[in-house]
C-alpha cells in the first residue's frame, strides 16, 4: 500500500544525497511538454490531439469513425464548459488541457485515496491522514532510525491546512491532490518555497547562501575534486540566482529558482484552438464551432471517453 508518500519522498532524498555524491539533485519544477510531436498543423494535428486529450489518451482514438468522434467530442465539450453557459472560453480550455496533462498525478492520487479514506466518505480528514501515516511512529518518542516524525508531522499538517481551501480540516480529491503535489497549484507555491528553504537553510537565518545551495546538490566528503557542474552551479548562483547580489537567496529569489516562470504551453495551445475554431470571432467557442473543427481537436480518433469521463467526474 502507498500509505506514506511524503515519508518515502523524504527518505529517498536522504539516500540520494548520501549515496551518489557526483550526481546533481534538481529542485527545479518544470511543466512537462504537451506532446512529443512537432506542432505543425500544415502536416497534421497530432500535437493538438495530444495537448487536448493527453498523449496516452490520444493513442486510443484510431478505431473511431468521424461520427463517433464528433459524438464523444460533444460530451467532452460539456465537461469543459465549467460554468455551463453554453460556451467554451480560452480559460476553460486552458484548464482542461492542464488537467489532461496531469493525468499521471490524478492516477497517483487515486491509487492512494483508498488507503487514507478510512470511513469511505469520499473525503480525507487530517486525522485520517495522520493516523495512517504517523500512528505507529508517534508511539515511540525516540525512534532509532534518525527521523524526527513529530517535526515531519507538523510540517505535513501545515501543508494540509494550506491545501484545505475551506478550512474544515477535511480534503476532497482536489484538495488532497494539492497536498500531495503542491508544485502543481498556484496557491500552494508559497509552501513549496518554504519547505525548500527549510530543507536547505542549515544555519536557520531564513536565507540560502552559496554553501548551503551547493551543499544541497553535492556531497563532497568522498571526493578530492569537484565535478565541473558544481563550478557551473556556483556561477549560476552568483550571476543569476542571487539577483540582488547580497550573497544569499531570499524567498522571492528561491521561488524564481525552483518555480521558474516557464512558457505556458497550455495557454498557448488554448489560444491556438480558439483562434482556429472561432468562426464568428467573439473570443469563445460554441459546441457547434468545436464539432465543425473536430479534426483539429480529435481527428478521426477519440479517447475511451467512457473511461475518461468517469475519471474526470471523480475530480
Curated annotation (Swiss-Prot):
GO MF terms, alphabetically ordered: calcium ion binding
Top-level taxon of the source organism: Eukaryota
CC terms in the record's Gene Ontology section: endoplasmic reticulum; endoplasmic reticulum membrane; extracellular region; Golgi apparatus; melanosome; sarcoplasmic reticulum lumen
Residues binding Ca(2+) 1, per UniProt: 81, 83, 85, 92
Keyword annotations of the record: Calcium, Endoplasmic reticulum, Glycoprotein, Golgi apparatus, Membrane, Metal-binding, Repeat, Sarcoplasmic reticulum, Secreted, Signal
This protein's record includes keyword Secreted: yes
Signal sequence interval, chain numbering: 1-19
Entry binding sites for Ca(2+) 5: 242, 244, 246, 248, 253
Domain EF-hand: 68-103, 104-139, 151-186, 188-223, 229-264, 265-300
SUPFAM superfamilies in the cross-refs: EF-hand (SSF47473)
Motif Prevents secretion from ER per record, residues: 312-315
Binding-site residues, Ca(2+) 2: 117, 119, 121, 123, 128
Keyword hit for Metal-binding: yes
Binding-site residues, Ca(2+) 3: 164, 166, 168, 175
Functional summary from the UniProt entry: Involved in regulation of vitamin K-dependent carboxylation of multiple N-terminal glutamate residues. Seems to inhibit gamma-carboxylase ggcx. Binds 7 calcium ions with a low affinity.
Subunit field text: Interacts with ggcx.
Protein name: Calumenin-A
Species: Danio rerio
Recorded name of the encoding gene: calua
Amino acid at each position: 500500500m502507498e500509505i506514506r508518500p511524503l515519508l518515502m519522498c523524504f527518505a529517498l532524498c536522504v539516500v540520494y544525497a548520501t549515496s551518489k555524491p557526483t550526481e546533481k539533485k534538481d529542485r527545479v519544477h518544470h511543466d512537462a511538454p504537451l506532446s512529443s510531436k512537432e506542432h505543425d498543423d500544415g502536416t497534421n494535428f497530432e500535437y493538438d490531439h495530444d495537448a487536448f486529450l493527453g498523449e496516452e489518451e490520444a493513442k486510443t482514438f484510431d478505431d473511431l469513425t468521424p461520427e463517433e468522434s464528433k459524438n464523444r467530442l460533444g460530451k467532452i465539450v460539456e465537461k469543459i464548459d465549467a460554468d455551463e453557459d453554453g460556451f467554451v472560453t480560452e480559460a476553460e480550455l486552458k484548464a482542461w488541457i492542464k488537467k489532461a496533462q496531469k493525468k499521471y498525478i490524478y492516477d497517483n492520487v487515486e491509487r492512494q485515496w483508498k488507503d487514507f479514506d478510512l470511513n469511505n466518505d469520499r473525503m480525507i480528514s487530517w486525522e485520517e491522514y495522520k493516523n495512517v501515516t504517523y500512528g505507529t511512529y508517534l508511539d515511540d518518542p525516540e525512534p532509532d532510525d534518525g527521523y524526527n516524525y513529530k517535526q515531519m508531522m507538523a510540517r505535513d499538517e501545515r501543508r494540509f491546512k494550506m491545501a484545505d481551501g475551506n478550512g474544515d480540516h477535511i480534503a476532497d480529491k482536489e484538495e488532497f491532490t494539492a497536498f500531495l503535489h503542491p508544485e502543481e497549484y498556484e496557491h500552494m507555491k508559497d509552501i513549496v518555497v518554504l519547505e525548500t528553504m527549510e530543507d536547505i537553510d542549515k544555519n536557520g537565518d531564513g536565507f540560502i547562501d552559496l554553501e548551503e545551495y551547493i551543499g544541497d546538490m553535492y556531497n563532497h566528503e568522498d571526493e578530492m575534486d569537484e565535478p565541473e557542474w558544481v563550478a557551473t552551479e556556483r556561477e549560476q548562483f552568483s550571476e543569476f540566482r542571487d539577483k540582488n547580489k547580497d550573497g544569499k537567496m531570499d524567498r522571492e529569489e528561491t521561488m524564481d529558482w525552483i518555480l521558474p516562470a516557464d512558457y505556458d504551453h497550455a495557454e498557448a495551445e488554448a489560444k491556438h484552438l480558439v483562434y482556429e475554431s472561432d468562426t464568428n470571432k467573439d473570443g469563445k467557442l460554441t459546441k457547434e464551432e468545436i464539432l465543425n473543427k473536430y479534426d483539429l481537436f480529435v481527428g478521426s480518433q477519440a479517447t475511451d471517453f467512457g473511461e475518461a469521463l468517469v475519471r474526470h467526474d471523480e475530480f
